[in-house]
């Protein structure tokens, strides 16, 4: 009988060890969310950390070139009627200290392009509000899921308090509302060589 009890003790210790590890992992994840972080949906990309306000920063490295990649993400305050489970978002993609792409992801399928760009590329016209200014822009239409933002809008947004995008969708016109205030501008400058610039009221 005693021998049987002794054989069970190591097994119980192993179970307790793995249970403790599981609990610690859960606590670590909760702390990440409590600090404003976010889990990355991409393989090879580190989970996001807060960089002020509602912004998160994600870091990764190109496996072939070793290039340092940084992605900044700002999720909208609201969602579109078509998909209440996925909010629109803005993402800045930077590689080796330079901005490569700023895109607007509405979280729903986009309608067909409604205008050509300077080089004939398909675009969708949107109305943008940055604080107390508003203007119409043609953003490059990418695979009916993304719009590539112009650099002027991007620079205006990162230093703004209010940022809104109105666009046509398959369910009618919708407005994505963002709260960009609080972003660590130093982090963006280091990762993307990007600084804020207020848009002209003209």
What are these regions (language model features)?
Residues 18-29:
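Bacterial N-terminal signal peptides
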């Amino acid at each position: 009988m005693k021998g049987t009890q002794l054989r069970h003790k190591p097994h119980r210790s192993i179970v307790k060890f793995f249970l403790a590890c599981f609990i610690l992992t859960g606590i670590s994840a909760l702390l990440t969310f409590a600090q404003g972080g976010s889990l990355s949906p991409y393989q090879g990309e580190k989970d996001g950390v807060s960089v002020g306000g509602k912004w998160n920063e994600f870091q990764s490295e190109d496996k072939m070139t070793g290039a340092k990649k940084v992605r900044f993400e700002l999720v909208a305050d609201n969602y579109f009627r078509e998909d209440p489970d996925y909010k629109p978002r803005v993402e800045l993609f930077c590689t080796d200290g330079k901005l490569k792409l700023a895109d607007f992801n509405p979280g729903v399928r986009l309608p067909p392009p409604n205008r050509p760009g300077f080089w004939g590329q398909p675009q969708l016209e949107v109305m943008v509000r940055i604080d107390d200014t508003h203007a119409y822009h043609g953003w490059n239409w990418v695979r009916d899921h993304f719009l590539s933002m112009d650099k002027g809008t991007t620079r205006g947004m990162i230093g703004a308090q209010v940022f809104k995008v109105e666009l046509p969708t398959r369910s009618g016109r919708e407005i994505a509302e963002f709260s960009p205030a609080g972003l660590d501008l130093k982090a963006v400058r280091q990762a993307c060589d990007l600084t804020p610039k207020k848009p002209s009221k003209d």
